[in-house]
Amino acid sequence: MSITLRTYIFLDALQPQLATFIGKTARGFLPVPGQASLWVEIAPGIAINRVTDAALKATKVQPAVQVVERAYGLLEVHHFDQGEVLAAGSTILDKLEVREEGRLKPQVMTHQIIRAVEAYQTQIINRNSQGMMILPGESLFILETQPAGYAVLAANEAEKAANVHLVNVTPYGAFGRLYLAGSEAEIDAAAEAAEAAIRSVSGVAQESFRDR
């Protein structure tokens, strides 16, 4: 079976809001702030089961997220010991017979900032989110990434860089999506950090996406 390594990203320390968001939304072993985390997204998705099996048998990491959807599969594992997480990553790469350098280079598909969000729009956003609430008058940053898994990298780095609220993050599917809220200045700083994090990831260039 030929495997495409779509996302492979190591987070040295989960930030408080992202760790808490994962804890609220995931169905596995929930992480806490400060733990190291590894996110792996592959195609075809069903192969993610073999990935989880290999990582858990070889190391002490715990999985929070395993998603098998139509085309892609996503796995998150975490541990306080960064060495355990890195070892899990090496095991996964060996199992799939791929290299980290062969991962897809992420693209920013959409990035937008809405200033002074109206009250009615905040209600719509909050009803469809699982994180912090956005309040009327705050600024909203929306980011879409391809592959989807890199949305968590953007979220983690944005939280490191600015005092913002993590409204929602979706790291699986065709595109990853990130919603952040806060003051105008803090959102500007968060957006810059999130996009810089995506640009910093090396990998195999993708063909430009075309909506058919």
Curated annotation (Swiss-Prot):
Artificial BMCs can be made in E.coli by expressing (Hoch_5815, Hoch_5812, Hoch_3341, Hoch_5816, Hoch_4425, Hoch_4426, Hoch_5814) or (BMC-H (Hoch_5815), BMC-P (Hoch_5814), and 3 BMC-T (Hoch_5812, Hoch_5816, Hoch_3341)). Cargo proteins can be targeted to this BMC. Keywords: Bacterial microcompartment. The keyword Chaperone does not apply. Disruption phenotype: Not required for efficient BMC formation; when deleted from an artificial operon (Hoch_5815, Hoch_5812, Hoch_3341, Hoch_5816, Hoch_4425, Hoch_4426, Hoch_5814) being expressed in E.coli, normal BMC shells form. It is found in: Bacterial microcompartment. A motif (Pore gating residues) lies at residues 69-70. The keyword Transmembrane does not apply. Its main location: other. GO terms for cellular component: bacterial microcompartment. It comes from the Bacteria. InterPro entries: BMC_CP, BMC_dom, CcmK-like_sf. Residues 4-106, 107-211 form the BMC circularly permuted domain. Belongs to the EutL/PduB family. These proteins have 2 BMC domains which evolve independently of each other, giving the term pseudohexamer to the trimerized subunit. Although the homotrimer fills the approximate space of a BMC hexamer protein, the BMC-T trimers are more compact. Their universal presence in BMCs indicates their structural importance. The homohexamers form pores at least 5 Angstroms in diameter; in the stacked homohexamer 1 pore is open and the other is closed. In the BMC the inner pore is fully or partially closed while the outer pore is closed. Homotrimerizes to form a pseudohexamer. These stack, with the concave faces together, in purified bacterial microcompartments (BMC). A minor component of the bacterial microcompartment (BMC) shell. Expression of 5 proteins in E.coli (BMC-H (Hoch_5815), BMC-P (Hoch_5814), and 3 BMC-T (Hoch_5812, Hoch_5816, Hoch_3341)) forms 40 nm artificial BMCs with a molecular mass of 6.5 MDa. One of 2 stacked pseudohexamers in the BMC. There are 20 BMC-T pseudohexamers per BMC, composed of mixed BMC-T1, BMC-T2 and BMC-T3. The shell facets are 20-30 Angstroms thick, with 1 of the stacked BMC-T trimers protruding to the exterior. This is Bacterial microcompartment protein trimer-2.
